[in-house]
Amino acid sequence: MIGNETDLHYKVVDLIRRYYPDSILVAGLGENQDTENKRLDSYKKGYMREQPDLMVLDYHKEYKGLCIEFKSPTNNYRVSKAQYELMNKYSNNGYKFILSNDYDEICIEVHDYMKGIRLPCKYCVKHFHNKNTLETHYRVIHRLSN
């Protein structure tokens, strides 16, 4: 049972790690900003207020990354003006942005996003669907062995 935003966050991360273990995940640390010293330290290290809860940074054919903002599954939430501005900022810069409290909806969006993931060749401009095709490309085109 998903009782709160944290449960939802954990469950989505578990899904991504299970089905897409090589994905590059970056978690926002907003919930950990509970003291003035932590907030100041995080700000100096580059943390932004209203940063997305989770980002997937794998190379995608259409997007620069996937941003997910989790909301409480109890339907007892509101979206702040700053969060709308954040969504627009990331969307306008080429990121796919999901704001949701629905695990099933998030799963569908994540799986849909992952279909567009491509692995770039380090030696040319081509991109590949999976490691096997990339490794074959390295062997055949660039004459590289594992």
Stretch-by-stretch model annotation:
Residues 1-118, 127-144:
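Catalytic phosphate/metal-binding cores of nucleic-acid and nucleotide-processing enzymes, i.e., regions
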Residues 124:
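Short Cys/His-rich metal-coordination motifs, predominantly Zn2+-binding knuckles/fingers
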